[in-house]
């Protein structure tokens, strides 16, 4: 199952023009959960009810986002400092819809307020169908190492499914998280950036014990082109090429001369130009 980008419930309410794109789902994506964020129980419940007939198998609530503009608006991981308000939001949403409500949160807001276990119990009491736990505090952002033991503690404290998140970059990481925490599922985030092969490799490794090789240079090149073509079809060539600049940093991470390649792509404005650059640079590798 995949999850949409997080979408502001208020933005949907006020018909922000960007929300339509964020809520869009292609049938080829398979099961998709839509992720909302917000702190107003009435608005969150109303929007959940409004979109529940959409192409989503579940509605997820982001209570773990560490970005300052979200936190300063008392949304995302700020709600970990206000579990009473979080409880109101989740209770209202569960009552408003028939589809499963899930919630993602962190270890805590900072090292002085590690409350993931209590937060999970609260969410379970509200009637949520599952929780996803990221093993870092909001204060950490993505620095340091994810604490998988907090995921284990949450798993032992609740009966609903627990999804582990944080520092899963390889199939071996995925297996180790399952073994060390007992979690019911794994959420891969940053580990998939520039590495869409990770899902197939994790699944194969867990099912067979065999570790599939990583992608070849030509497979990476072909995937970059495929990604660029799909973005172009979806957003238009100009926007697609601009967005591909950041994706290229992930696709080429660790490659020889990757810095030069990333510098050159900043000058690329067309899909044809991208193909020519990749042909020149990646064939040379």
Question: Where are the regions a protein language model picked out?
Answer:
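Active-site glycine- and acidic-residue-rich loops that bind
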Residues: 42-43, 84, 105-118
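Conserved radical SAM core fold
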Residues: 7-13, 41, 63-77, 133-140
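Non-cysteine beta-strand/loop elements that form the S-adenosyl-L-methionine
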Residues: 4, 58-66, 125-135, 188-191
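Alpha/beta catalytic cores of nucleotide-metabolism and tRNA/nucleoside-modifying enzymes
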Residues: 88-91, 96-98, 112-130, 142, ...
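Glycine-rich tight-turn/loop motif centered on a GG-T
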Residues: 68-85, 136-148, 208-213
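Hydrophobic faces of well-ordered beta-strands that scaffold small-molecule active sites
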Residues: 2-4, 32-36, 59, 101-105, ...
């Amino acid at each position: 199952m995949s999850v949409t980008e997080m979408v502001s419930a208020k933005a949907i309410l006020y018909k922000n023009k960007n929300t339509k794109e964020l809520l869009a789902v292609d049938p080829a994506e398979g099961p998709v959960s839509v992720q909302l964020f917000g702190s107003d129980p009435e608005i969150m419940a109303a929007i959940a009810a409004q979109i529940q007939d959409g192409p989503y198998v579940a509605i997820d609530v982001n209570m773990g986002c560490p970005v300052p503009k979200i936190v300063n608006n008392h949304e995302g991981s700020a709600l970990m400092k206000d579990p009473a308000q979080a409880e109101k939001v989740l209770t209202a949403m569960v009552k408003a819809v028939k589809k499963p409500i899930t919630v993602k949160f962190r270890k805590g807001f900072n090292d002085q307020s590690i409350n993931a276990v209590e937060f999970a119990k609260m969410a379970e009491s509200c009637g949520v169908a599952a929780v996803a736990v990221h093993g870092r505090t909001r204060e950490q952002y993505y620095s340091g190492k994810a604490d998988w033991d907090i995921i284990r503690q949450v798993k032992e404290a609740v009966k609903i499914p627990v999804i582990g998140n944080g520092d899963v970059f390889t199939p071996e990481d995925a297996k180790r998280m399952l073994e060390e925490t007992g979690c019911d599922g794994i959420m891969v985030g940053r580990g998939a950036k520039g590495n869409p092969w990770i899902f197939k490799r994790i699944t194969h490794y867990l099912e067979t014990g065999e570790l599939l090789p990583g992608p070849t240079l030509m497979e990476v090149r072909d995937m970059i082109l495929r990604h660029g073509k799909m973005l172009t079809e979806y957003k238009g060539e100009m926007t697609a090429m601009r967005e591909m600049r950041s994706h290229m940093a992930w696709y080429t991470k660790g490659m020889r001369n990757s810095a030069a390649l990333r510098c050159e792509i900043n000058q690329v404005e067309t899909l044809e130009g991208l193909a020519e650059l990749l042909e020149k640079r990646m064939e040379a590798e």
